[in-house]
Amino acid sequence: MDFDLWLADLAKAADLCLKPYRHALRFSGEPPAVLGDSSDCALLIEARNDQGERCPQRDLELEIYRSGSELNLMISWVQDPEAPMLWHGSHAVWMQAVSGERCERPADGAALEALCRRIRALLGGA
C-alpha cells in the first residue's frame, strides 16, 4: 500500500470523526518499512478549521504498535501533555497522561474512540 494513500485515508477518517476540522497526517519520525508489519509508527494528526487556518491546539499524536499479535493505538493531545490519553487495543482505556492511571472518558472522548475504531478497520486491510 502507498504511504500517501494510507495517510490520506487516515486523514479522511479524522475528518469524519473530528468535525468540523479538516486533517492532514504525517509521520513523526521514520515511517515503517512496510504497512501492517510489526514496526512501531508515530503520526501527527494536524487540524485546520473550515477557513484552512491551522489549529495546533487540536493536533493529536497517534502511536500505532503491535504487542504480540495485537494491534494497539495510543492517541494524545500534542498541546496538552496533561490531558487524558486514549489507549485502544481490544477496547478503549482512558488514562491520566502524567500517572498512567485509568480515568473516566473526557467529554470529547467519544469522537477519539470512534477515530480509533476507524483506524483499526483501515489497518486491518494493511
Identify the function of each model-found stretch.
Residues 1-61:
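Negatively charged, low-complexity tracts enriched in Asp/Glu with abundant Ser/Thr
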Residues 2, 80, 105-108:
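Serine/threonine-rich low-complexity intrinsically disordered regions
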Residues 14-15, 29, 85-86, 95, ...:
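Amphipathic alpha-helical interaction segments
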Residues 40, 49, 84, 100, ...:
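Functionally constrained cores in energy, signaling, and assembly domains
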Residues 51-53, 58-60, 81, 91, ...:
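Basic nucleic-acid-binding interfaces
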Residues 57, 74-76, 99, 124:
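Generic alpha-helix signal with a bias toward terminal, lower-confidence helices
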Residues 65-94:
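Short, internal acidic amphipathic alpha-helical interface segments
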Residues 90-126:
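Ampiphathic alpha-helical segments that act as solvent-exposed interaction surfaces
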